[in-house]
Amino acid sequence: MPWERALETRGRSLETRGRNLETRGRSLEARKAGEPFAAQVVNVLAAAAASVVWDWSKVALVANADGALPGIQTYALLIWNGRGFEGWMPAEATEDLNRVLARWRAELERLSRPVWAALFVGVVNDGGRLRSRWIAADDGDCGAWRIRLGESNVPMAERGLAGL
């Protein structure tokens, strides 16, 4: 797909570091199981952002799977030139992202580990070198990472990106 090749054609590095910042109560096995999936999410986000604008600076993703609605709900914010943009992600990237997120949850279930109800993934593009952070929340109400329909989710995304 064209958005997948966006970073390759520009020769950008896809160096990522998947880290779970909220490790209390999460087993090492569950954290290790999440790292490859977090890296895949980072790759999808970075390629999708590069397909929209080559010199993007930050991307934030929040995903909710609270059971009240079918599937996984996602919210993505792209920061470019100091401004935030919503609704930017190509449909193909959204589909790929949802597949990765569903496989991540399925793997945690297979391991009989707590499955995240909410997830934050932030990525910073520093001249083609990527830094990332992921935070999983397994409390049923999604906590600080609940996507609010009909409200601005920008402050939540910016809070997750702070200090990254």
Q: Could you describe each region identified by the protein language model?
A:
Residues G34-G67, Q73-T74:
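N-terminal, charge-rich interaction modules
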Residues S51-D66, E107-D126:
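Short glycine-rich, low-complexity/disordered patches
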Residues M1-E4, G122-L164:
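Acidic, proline/glycine-rich low-complexity IDRs
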Residues A30-E35, P90-T94:
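Short, surface-exposed loop/turn motifs that are enriched in glycine and acidic residues
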Residues A65-D96, R131-G143:
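Extended intrinsically disordered, low-complexity coil regions enriched in Ser, Thr, Gly, Ala
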Residues R5-L28:
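Long, intrinsically disordered low-complexity tandem-repeat segments
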Residues M89-A118:
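Short, solvent-exposed interaction modules
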Residues W3-E4, G25-G34, V41-V42:
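Leucine-rich tandem repeat or coiled-coil scaffolds
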